Amino acid sequence: MILVITNKEDSHPTPVIQLLTTRGISVFRLNTEALLTDYEFCWQNDAHHCDFTLANIQNGLSVRGTEVTAVWDRRPEPPTELPLQSTEVVDKHNREEALGFLRFLRYYLKDIPSIGSIVYDRVAASKMLQTTIAQQVGLSVPDTCFSNRKADILRFAMQYKEIVLKPIENSNIWNEDNEEEYALYTQKTSSASFHDVPEEAFTQTVSYVQNYVPKAYELRITMVGRRAFACKIDSQCLDEDKGKTDWRQGYDYGLKHEIYNLPQDIADKCIRFLQLMHLNF
């Protein structure tokens, strides 16, 4: 039995679940925002063993913890739905208790083979750790600087003709006034342009900059265990603000993708990278 821990809005698990089902593989989907409304659950132990049950009261499917042989932990959301509304304080407490249970249940499953990990995914998101491990396995990485001081960023930038600025954590900004979302893409700029930026622009936040590396094309490599699936992205035929600098901007401008035969030495380094990050995906 594969336990898929996700959310209602994520459509990507659906075709995967359908394919697994046609192959006779049992799957249980847990949409975490509806933990308290769409599911009944119980975890308990006695002197002999520990186990839990999950039952979807909407479709009648159920699973026991001892039946779970693999976990796909994909973008779970905090529990938000409640069977009944109470006061704001009580509702907040009930949601937090459900979130605590959900987190602890996912920790409890940490030793089961998984795609996605509550233990290591967050750690592996660290740009500093990614850079360090990538260098350790022999991958080339751009020179990088994080700082809240203009002097540090300027000193770093002056070593190069051009640098790129990247978001650290949040690549989107939601404007509540006009209810519009803005995407923060990687931006290329001349190093000299930093001279005119006021000091307070740096002290207000953390700047994440790297030297700009010209490229012939880009690769997006998906690792599943020891298997590498490489996609060549032909971003350099696009304009600067339409995918050349950040390929994600190219979706609406004819961005081309094609299968790429990844050299084995690069695949081996990617495998080692995942191993050191304690990830399977």
Predicted features along the sequence, with ranges:
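Extreme N-terminal starter segment of soluble prokaryotic enzymes
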Residues: 1-3
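Conserved N-proximal alpha/beta basic substrate-recognition cap immediately N-terminal to
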Residues: 7-22, 30-143
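Short, well-ordered alpha-helical microsegments
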Residues: 12-14, 150-154, 216-218
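Phosphate-binding site of ATP-dependent enzymes
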Residues: 20, 158-262
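A short linear hydrophobic-aromatic micro-motif
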Residues: 143, 207-208, 281
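A short, acidic, amphipathic alpha-helical segment used as a generic capping/interface helix at domain edges
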Residues: 265-274
